[in-house]
Curated annotation (Swiss-Prot):
Keyword annotations of the record: Ribonucleoprotein, Ribosomal protein
Family note: Belongs to the bacterial ribosomal protein bL19 family.
Species annotation: Pseudoalteromonas translucida (strain TAC 125)
Molecular-function annotations in GO: structural constituent of ribosome
GO biological process terms on file: translation
Name used for this protein in its record: Large ribosomal subunit protein bL19
GO cellular component: cytosolic large ribosomal subunit
Top-level taxonomic group: Bacteria
PANTHER family in UniProt: LARGE RIBOSOMAL SUBUNIT PROTEIN BL19M, RIBOSOMAL PROTEIN L19
Database matches in PROSITE patterns: RIBOSOMAL_L19 (PS01015)
Function: This protein is located at the 30S-50S ribosomal subunit interface and may play a role in the structure and function of the aminoacyl-tRNA binding site.
InterPro entries attached to this UniProt entry: Ribosomal_bL19, Ribosomal_bL19_CS, Ribosomal_bL19_sf, Translation_prot_SH3-like_sf
NCBIfam families linked to this entry: rplS_bact
Gene3D superfamilies the UniProt entry points to: 2.30.30.790
């Protein structure tokens, strides 16, 4: 019985997975278009920053994007397969040697820069 329930849950989750998510990782600069509802109107809001973490868990996958806005660091966690995310565009590939870039939180200015990956 438990196996049947697992198969049903897996089928439902597979149905909701997005297929148009590009391949990106920590260190990449991305632009996330988020659907924002204000009253009766719905519009797209762009959030551009560096991916500092990525969590791969199927339907529950998420990624954290960090940007500097008016001299203040802003981080936002996005659910990869959320219906509120319209699109994710990779602007720049970063050459990093870590999976999680939490050390960027303590850095500012030139020391917070990431080298571009040369292909």
């Amino acid at each position: 019985m438990a196996k049947v329930n697992q198969n049903i849950i897996k089928a439902l989750e597979d149905e909701q997975l997005k297929t148009d998510v590009p391949a990106f990782g920590a260190g990449d600069t991305v632009v996330v278009q988020v659907k924002v509802k204000e009253g009766a109107k719905e519009r797209l809001q762009a959030f551009e920053g560096v991916v500092i973490a990525k969590r791969n868990r199927g339907l529950h996958s998420a990624f954290t994007v960090r940007k500097i806005s008016n001299g203040e660091g802003v981080e936002r966690v996005f659910q990869t397969h959320s219906p509120l995310i319209d699109s994710v565009t990779v602007k720049r590939r970063g050459a990093v040697r870590r999976a999680k870039l939490y050390y960027l939180r303590e850095r500012s200015g030139k020391s917070a820069r990431i080298r571009e990956k040369l292909n």
